[in-house]
Amino acid sequence: MPASNVLFLGAPSTGKTSLVKALAEHYREPWMHELGKDYWIKHQVERRLSQDQLLEIAELHLAAELSLLEQANRFLFTDTNAITTYVFALDYYGYVEEGLTQLAQSAEQRYDWIFLCDTDIPYEDTWERSGAVFRNRFQQMIIDDLNARGLKYVLLSGSLDRRIKTVRNFLDA
């Protein structure tokens, strides 16, 4: 039986990476890091990426994710995906080009679980983030996009320990 691909979405500074790392450690399984953040730090110009660069992020992320999924036994814990990149493109430009739209659509069927990390934790203000106001607006954009796609998700709130416990209750059921 193939490993389950477990996706974590949420605006910047909602605890995705901490949660994914903790779950990967607990289950001794691989995790897919947020490739887009690393790419943005390296390639952004005036805090923006081009549509072509956003497409490249989604393509690189997908290739790395599929490779890690082959290595997983039970679970791959995935920190964001093409849907997040799609929402960033929508936020930056007001539209999304066809290639990224297609990758976001293909992502709709790839995950066994989708968890949305809530904004109820303190905002960590680092140079690559756009502020707490942006976090709340972007979070709503993600929620709206998930709902428009008809994707079911579990909202994770509270402390890291509470979020871990909630996810484990679903995965171990």
Could you say what each language-model-derived stretch is?
Residues K16:
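Conserved lysine of the Walker
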Residues A11:
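P-loop (Walker A) phosphate-binding loop of NTP-binding proteins
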Residues E25-L62, V167:
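Conserved substrate/cofactor phosphate-moiety recognition/catalytic segment
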Residues L19:
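Hydrophobic positions on the alpha1 helix immediately C-terminal to the Walker A/P-loop
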Residues V45-Y95:
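Conserved nucleotide-sensing/catalytic segment adjacent to the nucleotide-binding pocket
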